[in-house]
Curated annotation (Swiss-Prot):
Disulphides: 127-161
Entries under PROSITE patterns matching the protein: PROKAR_NTER_METHYL (PS00409)
CC per GO annotation: membrane; pilus
Gene: pilE1
Composition-biased stretches (Basic and acidic residues): 192-214
Name of this chain's protein: Type IV major pilin protein PilE1
GO BP: cell adhesion
Prosegment location in residue numbers: 1-7
Length: 214
């Protein structure tokens, strides 16, 4: 009389182990990316906390704050978190730097920047890789070439913090605007023909920019 075989055979065990190995190989990198993004979000949150003070300083003085004491009244080392070493304000550029330990290895000591410029009477903020501003009286920024190794991999940044306008041309689409002269980037809403504006509901989502026309 035949007896039922119980348990796994060697081949079945090897198949199970192989499947577990494949799942681990897929899941581990995904988990590492997730933890890095979560830690970077703290840097963005702390940096964004300085935006209102920097904006207020600019609107009151007409120039960007040169440093932390001028802009946010707190030393860079005092603005920190579990994963963030410091948040520095330099000529209006807010830069957060990750810690060297206790964080995901792919973002150790890495940086990101928030910066703003005046657009049609308002201040518009951007977020992306670390940048610098040569002086407090200008809106222009340049990539921080002193530390390319400090850039955070784009995959660890949220879609709202991947600005690459430096050194490139960015186009906008929206209601009709005018530019006073060919030597400036500034545009204003075309007030001579408000009746010529297309109702927003008839425009695609990619053609509803108002930041440059208010």
């Amino acid at each position: 009389m035949n007896t039922l075989q119980k348990g796994f055979t060697l081949i079945e065990l090897m198949i199970v182990i192989a499947i577990v190995g494949i799942l681990a190989a897929v899941a581990l990198p995904a988990y590492q990316d997730y933890t890095a993004r979560a830690q970077v979000s703290e840097a963005i949150l702390l940096a964004e906390g300085q935006k209102s003070a920097v904006t207020e300083y600019y609107l009151n003085h007409g120039i960007w704050p040169e440093n932390n004491p001028a802009g946010v009244a707190s030393p860079a080392s005092d603005i920190k978190g579990k994963y963030v070493q410091s948040v520095t304000v330099a000529n209006g550029v807010v830069t957060a730097q990750m810690k060297s330990d206790g964080v995901n290895k792919e973002i150790k000591n890495k940086k990101l920047s928030l910066w703003a410029r005046r657009e049609a009477g308002s201040v518009k903020w951007f977020c992306g890789q670390p940048v610098t501003r040569d002086n407090a009286g200008t809106d222009a920024v340049t990539a921080d070439t002193t530390g390319k190794d400090k850039e955070i991999d784009t995959k660890h940044l949220p879609s709202t913090c991947r600005c690459f306008q430096i050194g490139s041309v960015k186009w906008f689409c929206g209601q009709p605007v005018t530019r006073d002269n060919a030597g400036t980037d500034a545009v204003t809403a075309d007030t001579t023909g408000k009746d010529k504006e297309i109702d927003t509901k008839h425009l695609p989502s990619t053609c509803r920019d108002k930041s440059s026309a208010e």
